[in-house]
Amino acid sequence: MKPLTRIFVFLLAATSIWSLLGEMYRLWPMRFFTLAVFLPACGALIALALYSRWRGDGRAGRIILIGAIAGFVAAVAYDIFRLPFVFSKSWGLAGLVPSLPLFKVFPQFGAMILGKADSNSLAVILVGWAYHFSNGITFGVMYAAMVNGQWRRRWPVAIVFAVGLELAMLFTPYPAVFGIRVTDTFVVVTLAAHLIFGVTMGRVCIGLEKGVAKC
């Protein structure tokens, strides 16, 4: 992709995490930004990918698609790694694995987006999880824009990007807003989870390169 296109794609994808950052820093309500900015940005990304396929050489569309798929798969791997910590007590692992409420923020995401005080309704929980995966997908697209399809040569960038995101979030109001105790255990586990996210994202992009090229 051309430099300006890469920047445009990166910024469109970044609107997912910006919706949360703006809420935390009291710049805008997450509900407003999600509806007015993030969802239209998603539409613009899809439109750009389709236009690239139908009117161009398809390169931009392939890069966006590979990044989105890899980001989703990486988010799944990230959550699978965290499952033993979330369910440590119920799975009888308390003596081996520390119990950490790593999933408790997702319903709160949903409550912010829907503008509801109750974070226990099914709609709130589903929207919260959907937002969580939207972050994974858009992080994948952001990474794709950064490396511009040079998946094999630059795949370590995925690790730096993923771990850097977590380190940056630790210095935002995120822990305070969601009542998270930032202990040594929490930091180690979340950094390890983001390391897995980065490795998975980078390697999945490499694996998808040939398959998506045929589409």
Regions found by a protein language model. Give the residues of each.
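Interfacial helix-loop-helix junctions of multi-pass membrane proteins
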Residues: 84, 88-92, 171-193
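N-terminal signal-anchor transmembrane alpha helix
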Residues: 63-90
